Amino acid sequence: MAKDIYFNEDARKSLLSGVEKLSNAVKVTLGPKGRNVLIDKKFGSPTVTKDGVSVAREIELENPFENMGAQLLKEVAIKTNDVAGDGTTTATVLAYAIAREGLKNVSSGINPIGIKKGIDHAVNLAAEKIRQSAKKITTKEEIAQVASISANNDSYIGEKIAEAMDKVGKDGVITVEESKTFDTTISYVEGMQFDRGYLSPYFSTNKENMSVSFDDAFILIYEKKISSIKELLPVLEKVLGTNKPLLIIAEDIEGDALAALVLNSVRGALKVCAIKSPGFGDRRKAMLEDIAVLTGGVLISEELGITLETVEIEQLGQAKTIKVDKDNTTIINTGNKEQIKERSELIKKQIEDSTSEYDKEKLQERLAKLVGGVAVINVGAVTEVELKEKKHRVEDALSATRAAVEEGVVPGGGSTLIEVAMYLDTIDTSKLSYEEKQGFEIVKRSLEEPMRQIISNAGFEGSIYIHQIKTEKKGLGFDASSFKWVNMIESGIIDPAKVTRSALQNAASIAGLLLTTECAITDIKEEKNTSGGGGYPMDPGMGMM
């Protein structure tokens, strides 16, 4: 296919035009007085959102060169959202400001490579300053404040997230689901829960709801399939002597082994239940080892030289409570706290080392099941449109709150970026080249843009307030919702440090790419044939008489 090629100024101008269009659509959502954006859907009612990344995801421009610029900026929003869960609009505003100021300098003949070096130098210093300025959050009230701001100043959502996090701990899993009612509620699952139910309904101890409930039970954790009851007899006899229930977890239990267990359960000779191992492949073995640590047992594996026939009662796991239904198993643990802590640290290390988002998510789930259980926030709303929008806000707020717990918080409302700009003013740049100094200055000016936009969305002129904040004492900022000068931290106007830092770093990364672009290539659109087309070809001899 033939290509269309733009060079130099033409390429950069077209890309910047696309960046500007996406930035203008996203920036109206910034701050407490940010406006809604209405997004048309081909089917059903339009989506209403105040979430920057949702707006960015929807934008595709007709001009292919402008669209390339817009897609680059979209990457800033999506990356910031993935890393920190919030700050997408701030990142978009910063990226456009740095790109716009940078391209002015490039147009006047300044070397873009030098400008980019200066930008990177300033951003590295700024990111370190944000890290140092962060205040650790520990209380439920502080967590609720962060979550409320990330949920577009919805204090009810903030309180629910703080409540969930308080219950399951910072390593616990919190999932968000759609409620079947109008109310937003939280449900908790203590201990370890996994999606494996009983292999036969005849194991049920409660015939009304067809579930199994054991107290003070033994757990046999076996790596392979069990087909013969002969293998199981020695361990069954040992458990029978203790008069305690037994849960068997194995890759599968089939044939006469399953039949004999069901028969013993129905007759009341032995309280027993059998389930399949959770997970698949390598993850299955890891999860069985987790269960062994959680219950103080041993994974029965031939690799370790243990067979079913030689299992001792001390090698079985123990649980305070076990609940099994047709879909799920829940084990409330009695394991050694020290061993559980060691296992948790090992999983945390694997999370840090993993490069796959999917693997990280699965490891995080395993960690939560070991240390804190699972909380489910069931989001309710009156209409389908409101439900989708609300669920999205809760998910964003949850990610941002995790970021706040991880790296701490800084004053919000764009005031931290102004303080960072003032800090950059004190840095000695005499050893930088002229081009690098220009890049350094671009970052200092661009750091004012988020606050300027927040104030503009509230209906005021940003420049006056930005000048004033530079003369006020540290920690003060402009509260755009009440139109007052306040101490940002004390007033609960805070942002996760990770959100602010990620927004700036991602913005500078993409802006630097735009500045150093010298050529843009895209496919030439083929003109569609609009002449009637269909039917049979006319015989040459059948022209008009």
Swiss-Prot record:
Broad EC category: isomerase
Coarse class of the protein's main subcellular location: cytoplasm
Pfam family, one: Cpn60_TCP1
EC code(s) of this entry: 5.6.1.7
GO biological processes: protein refolding
Subcellular localization: Cytoplasm
InterPro entries the record matches: Chaperonin_Cpn60_CS, Cpn60/GroEL, Cpn60/GroEL/TCP-1, GroEL-like_apical_dom_sf, GROEL-like_equatorial_sf, TCP-1-like_intermed_sf
Residues noted as binding ATP in the record, renumbered to the chain: T29, L30, G31, P32, K50, D86, G87, T88, T89, T90, G413, D495
Annotated SUPFAM superfamilies: GroEL apical domain-like, GroEL equatorial domain-like, GroEL-intermediate domain like
Record field: transmembrane: none
Alphabetic keyword roster: ATP-binding, Chaperone, Cytoplasm, Isomerase, Nucleotide-binding
Catalytic activity: ATP + H2O + a folded polypeptide = ADP + phosphate + an unfolded polypeptide
A molecular-function term among this protein's GO annotations: ATP-dependent protein folding chaperone
Subunit description: Forms a cylinder of 14 subunits composed of two heptameric rings stacked back-to-back. Interacts with the co-chaperonin GroES.
Sequence similarity: Belongs to the chaperonin (HSP60) family.
UniProt function note: Together with its co-chaperonin GroES, plays an essential role in assisting protein folding. The GroEL-GroES system forms a nano-cage that allows encapsulation of the non-native substrate proteins and provides a physical environment optimized to promote and accelerate protein folding.
PANTHER family hit by this protein: 60 KDA HEAT SHOCK PROTEIN, MITOCHONDRIAL
Name of the molecule in the record: Chaperonin GroEL
Origin species: Borrelia garinii subsp. bavariensis (strain ATCC BAA-2496 / DSM 23469 / PBi)
